[in-house]
Structures are given as C-alpha cells and as structure tokens.
From Swiss-Prot:
Reported function: Acts as a chaperone.
Gene this chain is encoded by: dnaK
Protein name per the record: Chaperone protein DnaK
Keyword DNA damage in record: no
GO MF terms, alphabetically ordered: ATP binding; ATP-dependent protein folding chaperone; unfolded protein binding
CDD domains for the chain: ASKHA_NBD_HSP70_DnaK-like (cd10234)
Length: 596
C-alpha cells in the first residue's frame, strides 16, 4: 500500500508559531530546530536580517532583537491583508513574504523531524480574519512552497484537538482563544463525530502584545519619574523593555513576584543607568485588567449569536499563551460560571487541531466532520448606498447564495457590483472587498432586467462572486481578494526569491563553517607546534608556520574555496606531524586535530 502523504498542521501565530503532524493517528508537535524555549515547542514568530544580509527566524531572531531592533520584525500577522511594507536594508517586504519566511522554517523543521518532504499544509487563522487576510495567508503558504489545502479557524482547530478522543459525547463548547494579537470566542456544538460552529465573535486587535505594551509603558514611566530619561525614544532600550515585559508576564503566571533587571539600559551624562524593578502579580493584574475586561464583549456576542446563554455552555477551552494567566482564567470562569478545562496545552492545541484536520483531508481520520462558519455578513451595495446581505454572519461554510437584482435607471446597460463585508446597514460603514462590472445589458426600463448575483464561499472561507444577466446569459465573475493581493506572477516571483534566499542562506552557512574550520585548524596547528617544541624539525615547523600565515591571509579575503583548500593542506601537514612525532597512546592535540 502506498504511504499516505503527510499534511502539516500549522498554527501561524502573532507572537509564536507551532506545527504538528499525525503520527500513528495522533497529533504530534514538531519540535523547533533550536529546541524548547520559554515557549515550549513553539517558537517566536520573529524574523530578522543581520548586517551581513543573513536572515534569522524564530529564537535566533528574537535573541538578537535587542542589538538589531530596526531590522527585526515581530507580530507581522497583524498586518496580513494590508498594503503595509516592511523595509529592511533598502528592500521592501510584504506581510505575506515575512510570514512565508516563518512558514519556510516550519517546513524545514518538520522535514528534518520526519525525514521526508512536506508539500501540503493546513494553516489556522483567527475566526475573525476577513477575506483579505485569509487570502494573504494562503499566498504566504504558496511563497513558502506549501500547497495550503485548507484554512481552519483557530478555535475550531482547538476543538478538534480536544474532541478527538471524546467522539461519543454531545456537548456545547466555548473556545476562548486569546493569542498574541487577536481574541476569538467561538461557540461550537459537538456530537456524533461532527463539530458544528454555531457562532464566532472577536477582536483582531486585542491580545498578549497589548499586555506586554502595558507592562512596558509602566516600566518606562517609572524609570522616567526616577531619572527624567524617556526610554521609549531609544529603539534598543524599547526592545529590551519589551522582552522584559513579556518575560515578567510569563513568570507572574506561576509566581507572585518577579524582578525586572536591565543593567546599562541607557547612558546619561553622569554615567550608565540600570533599570531594576520588582513587579508583583497584583501590579501586573492592575495593569492588564482594562485589556482583560474587553474580553467580555466578544463572549456576550458569541452567546447571543448562537442563541444560547451562559448556562448552555458545557466546556470551556482556553487557547493561547495569555490564557495561562490566572487573571484571564478567573475572568472567563466567573463570566460563564464554570471551571475551564485544564487538560489542554493552550500553546499547542491549535497546531494539533490543524494536524487532525490534515488527517481528515488525507483520509487518515474517518467519521469526523468539521462544519465551520463565516464570521461576518457578506453582500453588495444597492440603491441609496444600502448594504444588502446575501450571506449572513455565522452561516456554515462552504455555502452558495443567489439573489435577483435589477437596474436603477432606464436604459441602463451596465451595473457596478460592489462587494462588502460587515454588519452595518450602510455600505460606507462596512469593509469593501472589491468591485466589478457587468456590461452589455440590453436597454430597458428600470427594474425590468433580471441580474442574478451569486456569492460562493469555499471551505477556506474565500469568496467568489458572479453576476449574470438572465435575459442575455452574459456573466461576469471574480474571486474577491485584497486590493494588495499578490498576482500569480508576483507569487511565482516571490517563490523564486524565497528559493534563492534559501540557497544564499545555505551558502552563507557553508562559508561560516569553512572559516570556522580554518580558524580552528590554525589554533590546532600552533598548539601542536608549541606542545612538541624541538621534536619537530625546523624545516617542518617552517612549513606549518608558512601555511598558517597563508591561511590567515586567505581568511581575511573572500575566496572561500581557497580557504577550504588551504585548510585541508594544513590539516594534512599537521596529521603528518602527528603520525611522525607523537608517541603512540599520546593525547596530544594533533591526534585530536586529525579526527576533525
């Protein structure tokens, strides 16, 4: 039987990212190549470019952020679906490209872990991501060399991870997903192997990053009161503050007090200044309470849209790093009146759920059905600037809806179709997704032509819209995408750039290794001569010293192959010395060098 192709499940997060894959029918988290950190097996969604042009992703990027803040990019997810560009070393990058670098790392780590090539992925997105943001996420996957077979809402993925071993229980689940940049609250019903999303609500600009900022601002204000110096004007100081704020937030989830200690945070006329501040959990909770209170609105809205009350909720699932904070857990428990489930890792369950959905699509998991919903209503602008809905929010997807419209003026031969997303009654108050024209309508009195407008949402939540004149059969259709969506040609170009970038990275890594080997060999050669002293004949010693000088000169240049060749030559000479002048059984350095 042919081996089934693995589909990678990816949680592409604002602050951290993770991936999982089905092994033996169970989701397994892919470990980051750098090993576990304070984030567990996930890694920071961080990309950096060093002065010599090397790209770093994940923990290595985060570690150097203090010394290189202007070339370190974090929280790019908040810019997905926008026309924002990030400029680094004179080159502009779209949010899709930066996200693709993160996805490339995930792909590479997964391939190293599994020992096989990964081509397909399921990527999770916040339930409240609009069409533009979803399309941008798919583009990022394509640039990274992945076939994104499905986009899944993050809360839905978390519920998949939770329900895998409980397929005989009927229940109502509330998924409270508070990540680095977004809050999603989802009400789901589960029974008979079917997950059905009843409603979703949230805030795309509310998350753990806001908490970090609150702590950071507090530290900066306290320091300014004590010293008169505004640290927020110093990029490096801000980066150190941001890291310290996040670290304090994480530590205070399990301890009652922590010390922020940032020596040499800045330099004043009277010398260097240090920031040393003790923060208690009580102080942290005072700082973040206004942010936590904002979580009530989406919970109320989700229950209202599902036609349910707090008493109807059977289980509460927490997702996202900030939900580890006691203040967040207590707030949710008090709001619903039930304890939260504690058997799930909030940092890993989304990736695990994505892997399960990948298993469903690959045919590895049977009898599990996922019915997702569209988070916002979709429709068109009609006469008078009114927003006419064709698909109501929280409609199960995939779905297709049609409605008949007509002309607004006599002898009108074309109509403009303005597609919108939102909940406001007037078109101008909602998000514009795109426009197109249907032309060639035969002249007729207003209201006579019949124009059928059809909205078709696929399983990824991506929208196709068509308009058809029923009298002539003429039809115009478009796939709604962001105004800044990359064209197929641009995506191809970005893929090639990504491949080129990967090759450059490999070359740079090889160059670094060759230079390091050369330095190491010089050290070994000099130490060997020093240890053996007069045992080495003068002409042999001169030969080694000459090769060392030549290798040092080459290291100062750019001819990598010459460095490699000269290193091999020096290695051979030192090995000959080892064979000729070191007694058997000796542990002199040259015997070690020969084994390098």
């Amino acid at each position: 039987m042919a081996k089934k192709e693995k589909i990678l499940g990816i949680d592409l997060g604002t602050s951290n990212s993770a991936a999982a894959v089905l092994i033996g029918g169970k989701p397994t988290i892919i470990p980051s190549a750098e090993g576990a950190s304070q984030y567990g097996k996930s890694f920071p969604s961080c990309v950096a470019f060093t002065e010599d042009g090397q790209m770093l992703v994940g923990e290595p990027a985060r570690r150097q952020a203090v010394t290189n803040p202007e070339n370190t990019i974090t929280a790019i997810k908040r810019s997905m679906g926008t026309d924002r560009k990030v400029k680094v070393h004179g080159k502009e990058y779209t949010p899709q490209e930066i996200s693709a670098f993160i996805l490339q790392k995930i792909k590479k780590d997964a391939e190293a872990f599994l020992g096989e090539e990964i081509k397909k992925a399921v990527i999770t997105v916040p339930a409240y991501f609009d069409d533009n943001q979803r399309t941008a996420t798919k583009d990022a996957g394509t640039i990274a060399g992945l076939d994104v077979v499905r986009l899944v809402n993050e809360p839905t993925a978390a519920s998949l991870a939770y329900g895998l071993d409980k397929e005989d229980e009927d229940m109502v689940i509330m998924v409270f997903d508070l990540g680095g940049g977004t809050l999603d609250v989802t009400i789901m019903e589960f029974g008979g192997g079917v997950f059905e999303v009843r409603s979703t609500s949230g805030d795309t600009q509310l998350g753990g990053t806001d908490m970090d900022n609150a702590i950071m601002n507090y530290l900066a204000e306290e320091f300014k009161m004590e010293t008169g110096i505004d640290l927020m004007e110093d990029d490096q100081a801000v980066q150190r503050l941001r890291e310290a704020a996040e670290k304090a937030k994480i530590e205070l989830s399990t301890t009652l007090t922590t010390e922020v200690n940032l020596p040499y945070i800045t330099v004043a006329q009277d010398g260097p200044k240090h920031l040393i501040k003790t923060i208690t959990r009580a102080k942290l909770e005072e700082l973040v309470d206004p942010i936590v209170q904002k979580c009530a609105g989406p919970m109320e809205q989700a229950l209202r849209d599902a036609g349910m009350t707090r008493e109807d909720v059977d289980k509460i699932i927490l997702v996202g790093g900030p939900t580890r904070m006691p203040i967040v857990q207590k707030f949710v428990e008090d709001f619903i009146g039930k304890p939260v489930e504690r058997g799930i890792d909030p940092m890993e369950c989304v990736a695990m759920g994505a892997a399960i959905q990948g298993g469903v699509l690959a045919g590895e998991i049977k009898d599990l059905v996922l019915l997702d919903v569209t988070p916002l209503s979709l429709g068109i602008e009609t006469l008078g600037g009114v927003f006419t809905k064709l698909i109501e929010r929280n409609t199960t997807i995939p779905t297709r809806k049609s409605q008949i419209f007509s002309t607004a003026a006599d002898n009108q031969t074309s109509v403009d179709i303005h597609v919108l997303q939102g909940e406001r009654p007037m078109a101008a108050d909602n998000t514009s997704l795109g426009r197109f024209q249907l032309v060639g309508i035969p002249p007729a009195p207003r209201g006579v032509p019949q124009i059928e407008v059809t909205f078709d949402i696929d399983a990824n939540g991506i929208l196709n819209v068509s308009a058809k004149d029923l009298g002539t059969g003429k039809e115009q259709a478009i796939t709604i995408t962001a105004p800044n969506k990359l064209s197929e040609e641009e995506i191809k170009q970005k893929i090639e750039e990504a491949k080129k970038h990967a090759e450059e990275d490999r070359r740079k890594q090889e160059e670094i290794e060759i230079r390091n080997n050369a330095d190491s060999m010089i050290y070994t050669a000099e130490k060997t001569l020093d240890e053996l002293g007069d045992k080495v004949p003068a002409e042999k010693k001169e030969e080694v010293e000459k090769q060392v000088r030549e290798l040092r000169e080459l290291i100062a240049g750019d001819d990598i192959q010459a460095i490699k060749s000269k290193t091999e030559e020096l290695t051979k000479t030192v090995q000959e010395i080892g064979v000729s002048y070191i007694p058997a059984g000796s542990t002199a350095t040259s015997s070690t060098a020969a084994g390098r």
